From Swiss-Prot:
Reaction catalyzed: adenosine(2503) in 23S rRNA + 2 reduced [2Fe-2S]-[ferredoxin] + 2 S-adenosyl-L-methionine = 2-methyladenosine(2503) in 23S rRNA + 5'-deoxyadenosine + L-methionine + 2 oxidized [2Fe-2S]-[ferredoxin] + S-adenosyl-L-homocysteine; adenosine(37) in tRNA + 2 reduced [2Fe-2S]-[ferredoxin] + 2 S-adenosyl-L-methionine = 2-methyladenosine(37) in tRNA + 5'-deoxyadenosine + L-methionine + 2 oxidized [2Fe-2S]-[ferredoxin] + S-adenosyl-L-homocysteine
Job of this protein: Specifically methylates position 2 of adenine 2503 in 23S rRNA and position 2 of adenine 37 in tRNAs. m2A2503 modification seems to play a crucial role in the proofreading step occurring at the peptidyl transferase center and thus would serve to optimize ribosomal fidelity.
GO MF annotations in UniProt: 4 iron, 4 sulfur cluster binding; metal ion binding; rRNA (adenine(2503)-C2-)-methyltransferase activity; rRNA binding; tRNA (adenine(37)-C2)-methyltransferase activity; tRNA binding
Gene for this chain: rlmN
EC number: 2.1.1.192
Protein name (Swiss-Prot/TrEMBL): Dual-specificity RNA methyltransferase RlmN
Cofactor(s) for this UniProt protein: [4Fe-4S] cluster
Other comment: Reaction proceeds by a ping-pong mechanism involving intermediate methylation of a conserved cysteine residue.
Record GO biological process: rRNA base methylation; tRNA methylation
Protein origin, superkingdom: Bacteria
Disulfide bonds: 115-346
Keyword Metal-binding appears in the UniProt entry: yes
PANTHER family: 23S RRNA METHYLTRANSFERASE (PTHR30544), RADICAL SAM CORE DOMAIN-CONTAINING PROTEIN (PTHR30544:SF5)
Active-site residues from the entry: 89, 346
Amino acid sequence: MKELVNILDFLPEELGEKIKPMFRVKQIYQWIYQKYANNFSDMSSLPKDLRLELAQNFHFSPVKCVKNEQSKDGSIKYLFELIDGLRVESVLLPMKEEKIDTEGKRISHARYTICVSSQVGCKSSCSFCLTAKGGLKRNLSAGEIVGQILWIKKQNNIPYERRVNIVYMGMGEPLDNLKNVSKAVKILAQNDGLAISPRRQTISTSGLAKQIKELGQMNLGVLLAISLHAVNDELRTELMPINKAYNIAAIMDAVREFPIDQRKRVMFEYLLIDGINDKLEHAKELVKLLNGIKAKVNLILFNPHEGSLYKRPSLENAIKFQDLLSSKGVTCTIRESKGLDISAACGQLKERAKEQ
């Protein structure tokens, strides 16, 4: 039996090499990403013989949802099974956004962020992260990354044109899978597809300096987030062994070279761990470290998980840390940890084995 190819892996120009004429590719993209077709036979504007040809050569179901859990805060965690049986998790984070209409009335509507995985597992071995405990199984293809987003939007009846933010902060180190992640960014940005601007896509990294430079040279227009979590190499190496390969100085050099929109900032994620990196002296060092960089600091309170040796700091200490940074002119927020009750928060995702 012929092995079917995942059509979500293809950019329009690549699909155009297999399907003629090109306007048919545009129609196929619209059926998949905008009309949320369930199968090729749904694509009624295509000739019957083309629909048959597509069904004989392609599929567009690279992920299958086997479980979902909804948090009391509205977040939904999805467990996806891939074609080879491996599993990844993704999270939908709905948020309310308020605006003033032309009559001066306050109106609110849903704004969505989707946190996607880029690998099955991770090899970075960060001591505070549950994902790393199982090691790295493999990279996801571009289509498997895109498939998570497409399935979540379709399942939640989110119109394709509705504004959505994508954060590559799920399972895996995105820059360790740069080829497929960068391709996913391009596929998601297609006007005949989901039309998610690169400016709404944030790639998070544990600090692979070489790949940060490579990403910058691609000029994709994406946002960059650095998982920093420590202000000196000794502590960072203890928390994040990847620091042995790319120390803080190397990361900062790469960040300074990274092209960023004038209206945007590089995000630095800083996980506050009780008694480890949450003292005011750490905050002072962080201010020095970010000098000259157009940065925004996102403080995250450690999210406990099974087997963890670390503790979550008090909100009071986090606010003191934030206040010091703000007083020195550093833009800083404390991230609200969503999905804690369903293990969907930062550092809590993992490849969950099949239930026996």
